[in-house]
Structures are given as C-alpha cells and as structure tokens.
Amino acid sequence: MAKIAAIAPDETDEIIYLLNEQSDVNELKKLPKNKLRLALPTVCRRVDKFKPLIETLLAQGYKKWEIGNYWGLSVLPKNGIDLSFDAPLYMLNTQAMQMAKEMNAGRVTLSVEDQLDNLGLIAAQAPLPVTMVVYQDAALFTSAACIRSNACKDCPRGEKWLKLEKDGQKYQALSKDCQTMLFAEQPLCFAVEAAEIKADYYRVDFVYKSYEAAKAAQVWNKVRRFEDAANCRKANLYRCL
C-alpha cells in the first residue's frame, strides 16, 4: 500500500491490484472502488481457493477485473463486469484483439515482448481500447513448480527472494504460494517510445518487486513525462526478426 500511497489517486485512471489467495478484503476498502481493478494471477494451481474470494468481491460490487490467463474466465461472470486482458494473453495482431472483444474483454494490454513497429501498428488499428505498459518488472517466466529445497509440510509459504547468476547475467527469483517467478535485475521501461504509440492507457507497474514509496513516486513522475527511468531494459522493441 505504501507504493500506492506515494501516488495521488487523481493522477491515475485506475489502480490495478493483484489478488492472491490470502488477499485481505478489508485492505481493498482503503482504495477508491471506482478506480480499482482487481487482477487475478497469471498462474493458479488452486483455482477452487480463489472462488470464495472472487464471489465475495463480486458481491461487494467490484466490477473491474483483469486476467492474465484463460483460467480467469472460468471463475468470473461472462456479463456484468468490466474485463481487461493483461499482457500474458498475447495481443500481437488485431485478429487476437478481435477475438478478445468477442470474449467480452473491454480492454487489452499490448505485449511487452513485441517490437516497436508492430506495437504502433496494432495500437492504431485496435478494435477496442489498448493499454501499453511503460514500466514493469516483467517476469521472464512463471512456473507452477517450487524452487525451494524444503519439504512442503515444513514450508512457511511466504514471499522469498533468491539471487541467481548464469553466464554473467544476474537474476532474482520470487518464490511465493508454491510458484516461482524469475526476473532480470533491471526493469523494462518503454516511456520514451510510448510517446509515439497512441495507446488509450499507459501503465506503470510496481507489482512484484519491493519499492520504497519515494522510489515509486520518482519512477511515476518520470515516466509520466515520457522519460525513461534509469537502468532499464528495452526487451524486444528494437530486435529484428
């Protein structure tokens, strides 16, 4: 919550909050409901454990939702909600976007793995509103396998970060809820390029790694001016296939 508190709500169109099995419903009440979009995790091993939480939040009037995997469609109603597709649901052409629209998505997110030319092309021709991620600690992969060495029965299950290195490249692995996510040391930042992409929404993401409030505010203020944060990566933006 400290990261969010550092950013004035009136500077945002909405706040995306990533749910987990232990999410505290009372914590959500501290955020403006009209701006809150609830996101389901990309990988979920225990769908049944999420259902009571989702049903509670729907009953409390939360209408904005986001999914990063098709399992989310099995636990959310087909109608009556504002549904967004996150970047792991690849939108690499307008045909994929049209299919998302037919699946009742009201918004899609451009892929952080795409090239700059294609991002501009499909954003201009999109059949529904698009979001462009301009800053994110994007997971290199998410696995439903646990990286920890201890037995499951002895595991505290809380968040644990591990540092890894291979071929001179440094990585950070997040172990949480029996899953593993691998991250590069540097975040993605497409702020400079975003100035040329006519997206409907631009997204700054502080979801996984820990950010002090002052650091989050610094990044937020910089990328809002379409300026890159320091020490960032560009992923595949300029890669030629």
Where does each model-flagged region fall?
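Active-site pocket-lining/capping segments in soluble small-molecule metabolic enzymes
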Residues: M1-M99, M103-L241
